[in-house]
Amino acid sequence: MNKLSSSAITTTWLAMIIIVLDQVTKYWANTSLTMGEPVAILPHLNLTLVYNYGAAFSFLSEVGGWQRWFFTALALVVGTALVIWLAKLPKRWTLEVVAINLVLSGAIGNVIDRILAGRVTDFVDFYIGSWHYATFNVADMGISIGAVLLIISEFWLKPRHEKKAHSTEESV
């Protein structure tokens, strides 16, 4: 059997679903919302169309345009590394595989925006009182949730599994 078909790379359909959801919701936001005007959805949650020309929390958003290509290149490098990582994992659903797919989908979703529009469309606005968290999108949710799951997988679950495997080897 082909090495790629027996690897977790075949799970990238999860990333594709998130990418499509991200792009559809961004299209909806761009065609249905008015820039900067919040639409109340729930207490503490608005939909507010904003454009991010930088990175997370609008980091480097006002430095002249070079950041578009810098963050595009960075996301492509990270995305390539994630695909290689998936290709080396066995074909089965683990927390690590789900996490990598979520981060990959978020990176690709935001790269599509940067390439096509030179900016990322954000529209989910969470707030408490007058404090507003950075406005975000579905791709950002994928990156954030995937990163948390990857940390849990790599630093809590894998070490436990490795300790258990090591203690089993010692008892033999």
Swiss-Prot record:
Keywords linked to the UniProt accession: Aspartyl protease, Cell inner membrane, Cell membrane, Hydrolase, Membrane, Protease, Transmembrane, Transmembrane helix
Enzyme class: hydrolase
Pathway: Protein modification; lipoprotein biosynthesis (signal peptide cleavage)
Major location (coarse): membrane
Single GO molecular function: aspartic-type endopeptidase activity
Subcellular localization(s) per the UniProt record: Cell inner membrane
Pfam families membership: Peptidase_A8
Catalytic activity: Release of signal peptides from bacterial membrane prolipoproteins. Hydrolyzes -Xaa-Yaa-Zaa-|-(S,diacylglyceryl)Cys-, in which Xaa is hydrophobic (preferably Leu), and Yaa (Ala or Ser) and Zaa (Gly or Ala) have small, neutral side chains
Catalytic site positions: D122, D140
Superkingdom field: Bacteria
Spans through the membrane: 4-24, 39-59, 69-89, 93-113, 136-156
Protein topology in the membrane: Multi-pass membrane protein
One GO biological process term: proteolysis
EC number, as in UniProt: 3.4.23.36
Any one annotated GO CC term: plasma membrane
HAMAP family: LspA
Family affiliation: Belongs to the peptidase A8 family.
Known role: This protein specifically catalyzes the removal of signal peptides from prolipoproteins.
Protein name: Lipoprotein signal peptidase
